[in-house]
Structures are given as structure tokens and as C-alpha cells.
Amino acid sequence: MASGLAEESELSPGESELAVNPFDGLPFSSCYYELLEQRRALPIWAARFLFLEHLESSPTGVVLVSGDPGSGKSTQIPQWCAEFALARGFQTGQVTVTQPYPLAAMSLASRVADEMDLTLGHEIGYSIPQEDCTGPNTMLRFCWDRLFLQEVASTRGPGAWSVLILDEAQERSVASDLLQGLLRDTRLRNLPGDPRVVVVTDPALEPKFQAFWGNSPIVRVPREPGGDPTLAYKDTVPTDLVEAACQAVLELCQQEEAPGDVLVYLPSEEEISLCCESLSGEMGTLAVPGPPPRVLPLHPGCAQAIQTVYEDTDVSVRKIVVTHWLADFSFSLPSIQHVIDSGLELRSVYNPRIRAESQVLRPISKCQAEARLLRAKGFPPGSCLRLYSKSTLELEAPPLPHPKVCEENLSSLVLLLMRKQIAEPGECHFLDRPAPEALMRALEDLDYLAALNDDGELSDLGVILSEFPLPPELAKALLASCEFNCVDEMLTLAAMLTAAPGFTRPPLSAGEAALRRALEHADGDHSSLIQVYEAFVQSGADEAWCQARGLNWESLCQARKLRAELVELMQRIELPLSQPAFGSEQNRRDLQKALLSGYFLKVARDTDGTGNYLLLTHKHVAQLSPYCSYRNRRTPAQPPTWVLYHSFSISKDNCLCIVSEIQPEMLVELAPPYFLSNLPPSESRDLLNQLREGTAEPPAAATETSSPQEYGDGCVLQ
């Protein structure tokens, strides 16, 4: 495709001073031409016309693009697709780019808006959780892939698409893998506009995607010219990775012959924070010429602060960027000259057999190691220090990243598949098929939640559950709150449970600990979360107020946005709201009932009175989290006998997280009878069955009627 539009973008200021931007009709700014020179220097620029030809003529409507990190794929391909759509007048809709991480979608939208000389939030936009920066004239949108999948499966969405770009497909996110499966299935290739599809990946996964997509054309981005980085290994893995990484950074900073920015890879956010804190303390006293280096974290918790990584500073100020797997393929930083790679990642892996997640510290893949090495490739080539041995990489590292669809709870995935009217989740094409046990467990959980009817199809309740950007059990609890007249409190709780953790981890000062303790509620962790949120709102969302109590201000702001989004969704699907009643005895019981309606699968009983909890659904013993409000009270008290928990971790702490006391009579009342019958043999099951047999009449608490609703009408979940 050699359109006039494509030729226009080759112009320089000297060639046409009157050139106008075809997307908004305004003259190009001088900044546009400066960025155009940088774009032309990217390795992918050489493949531009080949890509446009394949996009025009692909027999399958699909184009594969394979290239190294930093080659310009994520910024240039969306612009070329926008040119393609503009040449057709955007007759079939906008261009949408999916990203595996919300922060990447936001960051790329900002960069592409600058390069195209357009306005962010107008022609160029992004959609991430709790933030929709788009407008009616948005023609190029960057979107978190899970949010886009939710749009495709539900009644929401912008309408139609000219081109759909699945970027960073090698990350193997659940949403990206499922979108490819749905798009490959010709029965489901009925998205509005019948969009062209572009799948962008790393060369290591090119054969896998090529086999999956058949005879679709592929565009291979040439590797950036220049020497390879100097590569060094450690003979053994250090016992303290943070200390070893800090030491390596300090040594680099003291070498005059090693200028340039540094990228440090550590396993987890906790280690990133420790490393940044340690390095920041050292930099002020470091004997180096010029200003001290600037230490910057890069992880999902950074939120809007992520853009500071890209801010132009004095070239004499060295940047030390400390990150983890987030920057394996995303967030290319051209100024990086040196990489320090720990070779490890901390990931959450779901075990469907016991419905629990574990934090697994494991070696990165060979593909990730190569991507990290290439971050230091350039003019002149930099260096890469691997804090592990070459034999460790060769013998212990898997060749490719682990597909997330084989490691996550699949309940939400199966719910979406059912929404797309796939009779059996097993019928969907997967790049890597999940274990049958994981799919069956997801179906079982959805059946317990009444999301499926007697024929195994999605029930009316299941359709409503699929509309919510929440895990199915939390969505069910929110719907149940309509019946129990505690919607206001449950909306707050759903937002707090979904947003990033609102508490900073100890150690806290004595003053911070005392102020935080004052926010704890006697009814348990769930009520404490509601109390924290309400106090935060009453403070005027004051950041200093949060810091004084060891609270994460950005997480609480995120929860506030999510709550507003949930309120809007409840109103759109005409579900009733309720007036606030938090703190009353009736509201306490109603909130417990709503929670149990969704979380009856997550109940445990203290079997010996010492805090050893036996999980109801399987014979596994756990303890309360060290951060649980029941353990942090000034006056020691006997732990509650029966508890409902939000999550269970079988990692090093083996604990129940976010816990509240419940009454077993309430569990018998609200859990499906066949669920109680299917519990494994235990004393807890016997006690519940005795309660069920001895309560032909509802218990006293259950016979009490809620006060009449003052706002909206109630609903009853069948």
C-alpha cells in the first residue's frame, strides 16, 4: 500500500512547511518532525511498507509481526494501522491495541499521541481499569487486554473495529490467549466491522504463533545493528539478591568508563522497594562526578508515576531503573546501557485442587533472559550482569514464558466463554490448553454460584455476573447485597478488595501503627476495609492523612474510582442501591449474609482453639495472616471459631488473608445444600449437617426482616 497518506508522513520541515496532519487538519508542529527522525531510526521502520501490504492483502485477515524488544513495534504498528483505517475513512470503526498491562496501555498512548502530533484523550486514547481517557472522536485506542475481553463478551464496547492489534502476545496473558482463540474460531469471528487482526510477538515465540495462525503472512523486524552487550555471569546465585544488585549498581556508578542508565531486574515489588530505598540512601554519599544518579522504581504499583521513567533529564544525571517481569518486553528505555538481571521472578500460581494461590519464586525463561540482555544493545553496546551461573540458565530455565492460562483461576475465563455461547469451554482453541481439572473446577464453582442452569448453560444470574469486572464470587456477593439491603457497604468492599492493597507493609512507626489500629473494626477485616475507605473519603482523600497511617494513597484513590464505576454499572443494569447503614447490628448481619452468598466456598473452622484453621473444602490447615485485625488487637482474645476468608496463600506464610467471623447457622442457610453434601468428611461437615437437620425452621437471626429500603427496590436471588 503506497497511499498518499503514507507518503505524507515521510515529509520533513524543509520539504513541506505547509504539511497538515491528516488526522486533525492542523499543521504539523516542529516536535512532530523531531520525533519523526527518531521513528525513522527504529529497526521496524524498514518493514513499514511490507507490513502495510500484508495488512491490505492477507488472505486470512491476520498479520503476524515478530521483533525484538525496543525495535519500535508497539509505537509504530498502531500508527500504520491508523493510516490504513484513515485511508478507508474509518468506515468500519476505530483501531484498538490491547496490552497485557494497564500501565503499558497508558504509557504507549501518551507516546503515540506525541509522535502523531495529536491530543491524548481526543484522537488518541486509552482504557484501563478505573480510567477511560477516550472521546467520541477517538480513532486509536490502547486498552488493557482483560478489559477489552470483557467488552467483547458483554454488551459494552465502542462498537466496531477496523484493526485489532494484540500487542506483546508473548506475555501469554489469559486475555490475549483467549482473544486469539476466539478470533481464530470462524464461528466467533463476528466482531463488528470484521476487523483485520495483527498479532505482535517476540521472535522466540514466532514458530508457535505461526503454527497457530496457519498461512497468515509474517513480518520479521530486522535486529538492530551494533555490537552485542558484554555478558557476565555470577558463579553462584547470591543469598541476598537485593544486596548483590545494589553492590553491582554502585560499582557501575563508580566506573568512569561505564556511562549510561542502568536497568535492574529483581523478582518482586517488595525487593524493588528495598533496593530503591537502599540505593537512594547510598547515592547521596557516592563519590561520583556530577549530580548523583536518580533511582526510579518501575512496577504496577507506580501508577501515574510510571511516566517519570521517561522524563527527559540532564544527560549528566544517570537513571537507575529498578523493575521486575513488567519490563521484560514492555517499557523500552533507549537510554539503558547496563542491565543487572537476578534471573528470578515471583509469580502467583493458582492450585484448583485446593482453590488457593501460591507465590512461586522461579527462574525466568530463556526467552526472558534474552530479552533482558537485548535491553543493553545499542551504540555503543552496553553490559549485562546475570546474578546467576550460565549452567543455571541452561539447565533450569524453561525455553519460553509460562502461559498464564495454565496458572490462574479460570472461573472468570469460563464465565466469559459461556457468555460467548460456547457450549463447552474445551471447544475453544487455546495456544496451550488448560488442565482439564482446572476447567472442571471452574465449572463446578460457577455451578455452586448458580451461574449455570440445570442444562449446564449460563443462567440469567450468570449473565449478570459476567457484566461485572469482578471475580464471580465477589460479583455474586454484590448481587446478594441487593437482597440483604447492604449495597452501599458491599460496593465499598468490592472496590477495596479489587484495587491494589491499601496498606503499606510494616515496619511502621509507633505513631503510624497507633493511627492505623484506630481504623480496625471489631467485626473483622472486611468491616475494617469499609471503615478505612470511609475515613479516607471523610479526610478529603488527603495524601498526608494516608501517609500518617501507613496507607497507600494511590490504591485508595483507585478504589474510589472503581466504586464509582460499579455504582454506574449497577444503575445501568437497573439493580437497586441502598442507603448507608454501616455500623448497625442489622447491617453487620446483612453484610455477613451477602459475603457468604458469594464466599461460602472460602470458609474455615478453628479446630483446636489455637488458630489452626481447617479449610472446609479440603483438609488443609492454615493460620490467620500476621496482618489480620484479629491478631493485631491490644488485648489478646481467642480467635474466632468460624471464619470467611478472601484468599488463601500456600506460600511461605500459609495463611488466610482478609478474614471475618461468621456464624455456622448462616452458612447452612445460604450455601447450596448440595455444596454441604459434597464437602469432604470432617468434624466441620458433621456439625453443619447437624445444624441443617436441626433447623427445619430458620434460626432466629434469619427470621428477622430487614428494615424497609429507603432507596430503591429490593431483589431476591434465586
From Swiss-Prot:
Domain Helicase C-terminal: 245-447
Subcellular location: Nucleus
The organism of origin for this protein: Mus musculus
Annotated residues for binding of ATP: 67-74
Gene Ontology CC entries for this record: nucleus
Organs and tissues of expression: Ubiquitous.
Keyword Nucleus on entry: yes
One MF annotation (Gene Ontology) recorded for this entry: ATP binding
Alphabetical list of Pfam families matching this protein: HA2_C, HA2_N, OB_NTP_bind
Main location: nucleus
Protein name: ATP-dependent RNA helicase homolog DQX1
Function noted in UniProt: Might be involved in RNA metabolism; it is missing helicase motif III and may not have helicase activity.
Skewed-composition ranges (Low complexity): 696-708
Gene that encodes it: Dqx1
Domain Helicase ATP-binding: 54-222
Record keywords: ATP-binding, Nucleotide-binding, Nucleus
Chain span(s) of sequence motif DEAQ box: 167-170
Family annotation (InterPro entries): DEAD-box_helicase_OB_fold, HA2_WH, Helicase-assoc_dom, Helicase_ATP-bd, P-loop_NTPase
